[in-house]
Amino acid sequence: MRYIIILAVLFINSIHAKITSYKFESVNFDSKIEWTGDGLYNISLKNYGIKTWQTMYTNVPEGTYDISAFPKNDFVSFWVKFEQGDYKVEEYCTGLCVEVKIGPPTVTLTEYDDHINLYIEHPYATRGSKKIPIYKRGDMCDIYLLYTANFTFGDSEEPVTYDIDDYDCTSTGCSIDFATTEKVCVTAQGATEGFLEKITPWSSEVCLTPKKNVYTCAIRSKEDVPNFKDKMARVIKRKFNKQSQSYLTKFLGSTSNDVTTFLSMLNLTKYS
């Protein structure tokens, strides 16, 4: 009778064996599966075009498991199989190059005597203890990112957007120089061209306040000129004597008018 009870319990457990949830996610080619289900499972993977299944884990409970070493880093699909006794279930993935998400770049600002350097470090994959930049590598789907940086100067509420040219990039990151002595904050985002359509999150914002006392003001259109004029008028009033103020105020007025005219001409050219 005892053997019959044991067999009955085993039979009941096999009936209730079931994967109740499953999730695959790969960020920077760090690939993991997360699943829930009763009991212990053998987990294997098969890439498209290969007949055999690769054993990844044996007799493991529900949880999160690293499978980075098993899917091919290309566009072929693959399957993940869970087995417990006679119960089997296969989960399909369209391919690592399609599914992988790319994390944000890392931004650094460094001040030099006559300029500031913006350095954007590529997101990287981890292979053991090595950090490998994700940039035009065949084993990482030939992914490379084109970056957009948002600069915020001084007390401005609106950022200035700048697209980084790939000519400014190497296999490790992108570097551009610029000049300002107002506080500047920068954040960057990367995106691929083509059908993969990868877009990273925005990086953490970094800020730098230069030491030199030179004043700048971002002008993107003629609507920004009055703000520039008001700001420079305050600088003239605070930093120069009355005799100099008169000359500099006239010069500021004529310069502001010239800038407004120039920007208006550019706008007409743009829409002509």
Curated annotation (Swiss-Prot):
<keyword id="KW-0945">Host-virus interaction</keyword>
<protein>
    <recommendedName>
        <fullName>Soluble interferon gamma receptor OPG193</fullName>
    </recommendedName>
</protein>
<feature type="glycosylation site" description="N-linked (GlcNAc...) asparagine; by host">
    <location>
        <position position="267"/>
    </location>
</feature>
<keyword id="KW-0325">Glycoprotein</keyword>
<dbReference type="GO" id="GO:0004896">
    <property type="term" value="F:cytokine receptor activity"/>
</dbReference>
<dbReference type="Pfam" id="PF22325">
    <property type="entry name" value="CR4_N"/>
</dbReference>
<dbReference type="InterPro" id="IPR054752">
    <property type="entry name" value="CR4_N"/>
</dbReference>
<keyword id="KW-1090">Inhibition of host innate immune response by virus</keyword>
<dbReference type="GO" id="GO:0039502">
    <property type="term" value="P:symbiont-mediated suppression of host type I interferon-mediated signaling pathway"/>
</dbReference>
<keyword id="KW-0244">Early protein</keyword>
<dbReference type="InterPro" id="IPR013783">
    <property type="entry name" value="Ig-like_fold"/>
</dbReference>
<comment type="function">
    <text>Counteracts the antiviral effects of host IFN-gamma. Acts as a soluble IFN-gamma receptor and thus inhibits the interaction between host IFN-gamma and its receptor.</text>
</comment>
<feature type="glycosylation site" description="N-linked (GlcNAc...) asparagine; by host">
    <location>
        <position position="150"/>
    </location>
</feature>
<dbReference type="InterPro" id="IPR021126">
    <property type="entry name" value="IFN_gamma_rc_D2_pox/mammal"/>
</dbReference>
<dbReference type="GO" id="GO:0052170">
    <property type="term" value="P:symbiont-mediated suppression of host innate immune response"/>
</dbReference>
<dbReference type="GO" id="GO:0005576">
    <property type="term" value="C:extracellular region"/>
</dbReference>
<feature type="glycosylation site" description="N-linked (GlcNAc...) asparagine; by host">
    <location>
        <position position="42"/>
    </location>
</feature>
<keyword id="KW-0732">Signal</keyword>
<dbReference type="Pfam" id="PF07140">
    <property type="entry name" value="IFNGR1_D2"/>
</dbReference>
<comment type="similarity">
    <text>Belongs to the type II cytokine receptor family.</text>
</comment>
<keyword id="KW-0899">Viral immunoevasion</keyword>
<dbReference type="InterPro" id="IPR036116">
    <property type="entry name" value="FN3_sf"/>
</dbReference>
<feature type="signal peptide">
    <location>
        <begin position="1"/>
        <end position="13"/>
    </location>
</feature>
<comment type="subunit">
    <text>Homodimer. Interacts with host IFNG.</text>
</comment>
<keyword id="KW-0964">Secreted</keyword>
<dbReference type="GO" id="GO:0060333">
    <property type="term" value="P:type II interferon-mediated signaling pathway"/>
</dbReference>
<keyword id="KW-1114">Inhibition of host interferon signaling pathway by virus</keyword>
<keyword id="KW-0922">Interferon antiviral system evasion</keyword>
